[in-house]
Amino acid sequence: MPEIYVYAVEGRSLDQKRGLVQDITAAVVKNFNVDAASVMVQIVESSKDNKAKGGVLFSER
């Protein structure tokens, strides 16, 4: 069972998340030759106060 984790800052809509997991699932099905039902995708969100890039919090960008 392939498991894919997506780490992202919170703020995406449910429609955006739905589209992402559908696209990821389709790519795994195509490239790994597995059934869609066996593909697990988990979106792990963090607040902008808890994530930084280049030493700058996303909430301060």
Segments from the language model and where they lie:
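A domain-level signal for the structural core that forms small-molecule/cofactor-binding pockets
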Residues: 2-61
